[in-house]
Curated annotation (Swiss-Prot):
NCBIfam families: rpsS_bact. One of its GO terms (cellular component) is small ribosomal subunit. Keywords: Ribonucleoprotein, Ribosomal protein, RNA-binding, rRNA-binding. The gene is rpsS. This is Small ribosomal subunit protein uS19. PROSITE patterns: RIBOSOMAL_S19 (PS00323). GO terms for biological process: ribosomal small subunit assembly; translation. One of its GO terms (molecular function) is structural constituent of ribosome. HAMAP family: Ribosomal_uS19 (MF_00531). Protein S19 forms a complex with S13 that binds strongly to the 16S ribosomal RNA.
Length: 92
């Protein structure tokens, strides 16, 4: 179930302030955030935002097709290393 349209999209205030401060800057730095729940706004396009995945900050370059999605969608929290191979043949 999605968010109500009358409420509008959510973005943390501290993240929005960091993005607005970077818009006037000549050189764009990586913006570090722990807010995986924030929605990507059109003003974020072109920035690199480092999203925390529980261990480290994963750099995510924001593109136009990401607008409307959440930041956490682009920083996976779990590492999948594949299923363990069966060693039934080698045990005989």
């Amino acid at each position: 179930m999605g968010r109500s349209l009358k409420k509008g999209p959510f973005v943390d205030d501290h993240l929005m302030k960091k993005v607005e401060a970077q818009q006037g800057a000549e050189k764009k730095k990586v913006i570090k955030t722990w807010s995986r729940r924030s929605t990507i706004f059109p003003s974020f396009v072109g920035f690199t935002i480092a999203v925390y995945d529980g261990r480290k900050h994963v750099p995510v370059y924001i593109q136009e097709d990401m607008v409307g999605h959440k930041l956490g969608e682009f920083a996976p929290t779990r590492t999948y290393r594949g299923h363990v191979a069966d060693d039934k043949k080698t045990k005989r």
